[in-house]
Amino acid sequence: MEEKSDIAKKKGIVNEKDGSAMVHIPAGTFLMGNEKNSVNVEAFYIDKYPITNNQYKKFIDETNYAEPAFWKNVKFNNPEQPVVGVNWTDAVAYANWAGKRLPEEKEWEKASRGTDGREYPWGNVKPDQSLAVFDLEISKGAPTNVGTHLSGVSPFGCYDMSGNIWEWCQEWYTEGKYRVVRGGSWINHLNILSCSYRSCSVPAGKDNNVGFRCVKDSA
């Protein structure tokens, strides 16, 4: 795939366990949230794409872990679609198996937004269907294969961080009740797709618009 950002070419790894391409996010500050506060983040690697059904199948095959919801639904089980129907615990189990972890919110947002406080991964232009997957009918729509929207790439070279699927993060949104999800999804309105938008889901939820990507500490 053609990379839009020169930054993305500087450093990257392939995670041996699950074969995921990961991009390097350098240490330093970025502008976080609607208030654009300066927040420091240590260096880390993050999956270039959300975890796919194909990758999750390898995890299931090696561990006998339970299949996700929607696993046999043809709308959601293409090997290169992002895995959905996984709850927070499922995502953590996969991350542990792969030698990775779920991202902290600040890590996720920096990977999505870059350092300049932009509204969306690609800049400040409002989303359209060439940039992201959103606002589809529940009865007819579904997530696209990962990496389909090349123009929606983030400054660091991450794909699908706006729309397509929500992504689980480490933190509680409300302690003991909801976990943070980020990014918006294929069924959401464009107003929800900004890099700073925060939402949540019950940790046990297995929805057809929630998946995840992982991070790994930088050596």
Question: What do these predicted regions represent?
Answer:
Residues 27, 43, 52, 124, ...:
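Non-catalytic surface loops within mature trypsin-like serine protease
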Residues 31, 66, 72-208:
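Functional-site microenvironments in short loops/helix caps that host divalent-cation chemistry
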